[in-house]
UniProtKB/Swiss-Prot annotation:
Residues 21-31, 42-52 have a biased composition (Gly residues). Part of the 50S ribosomal subunit. One of its GO terms (biological process) is translation. One of its GO terms (molecular function) is structural constituent of ribosome. InterPro entries: Ribosomal_uL15 (IPR030878), Ribosomal_uL15/eL18 (IPR021131), Ribosomal_uL15/eL18_sf (IPR036227), Ribosomal_uL15_bac-type (IPR005749), Ribosomal_uL15_CS (IPR001196). Belongs to the universal ribosomal protein uL15 family. Residues 1-57 are annotated as: Disordered. GO terms for cellular component: cytosolic large ribosomal subunit. PROSITE patterns: RIBOSOMAL_L15. It comes from Desulfosudis oleivorans (strain DSM 6200 / JCM 39069 / Hxd3) (Desulfococcus oleovorans). This is Large ribosomal subunit protein uL15.
Length: 147
């Protein structure tokens, strides 16, 4: 056995069904499509989701909700995520994107209070929770709310 004479394991492959190749093949004439009718024709067959004229499922179910076109996409950053920054550094949108904490285009950044921090940082974000503000200021840092 070498690369020049490989063959599949016995029983692992199945011969393809050759349609419309004479009556002796068992799949000649109509090629397994039956006699006449919509599905026997070229391009025949119903569209996906068609249920034979019955009211389809996607129309039987009620509509729900809407998309608010004025919604703001606010990225969330927690205090514990700020451990990636050195003491005394300025943490703003650019710095957060550089560290991979904020991805893509966002309308604002909100700092939340999950976790702890032991050294001072200057944080510039558009929104901040009360607990996050207390923790940053307790560590000797400063919060600057930008719009």
């Amino acid at each position: 056995m070498d690369l020049s004479n490989l063959s599949p394991a016995p029983g692992s492959t199945k011969a393809r069904k050759r349609l419309g190749r004479g009556p002796g093949s068992g799949n000649g004439t109509t090629a397994g499509r039956g006699n006449k009718g919509h599905n026997s024709r070229s391009g025949g067959g119903v569209r996906p989701g068609f249920e034979g004229g019955q009211m389809p499922l996607h129309r039987r179910l009620p509509k729900r909700g809407f998309v608010n076109i004025f919604a703001k996409d606010i990225a969330v950053v927690n205090i514990r995520d700020l451990a990636r920054f050195e003491s005394g550094s300025v943490v703003d949108g650019e710095a957060l994107k550089a560290k991979g904490l904020v991805k893509g285009r966002v309308d604002g950044i909100k700092l939340l209070g999950k976790g702890d921090i032991a050294y001072p940082l200057t944080v510039k974000v558009s929104h901040v929770s009360r607990s996050a503000r207390e923790k940053i200021e307790a560590a000797g840092g400063a919060i600057e709310v930008i719009s």
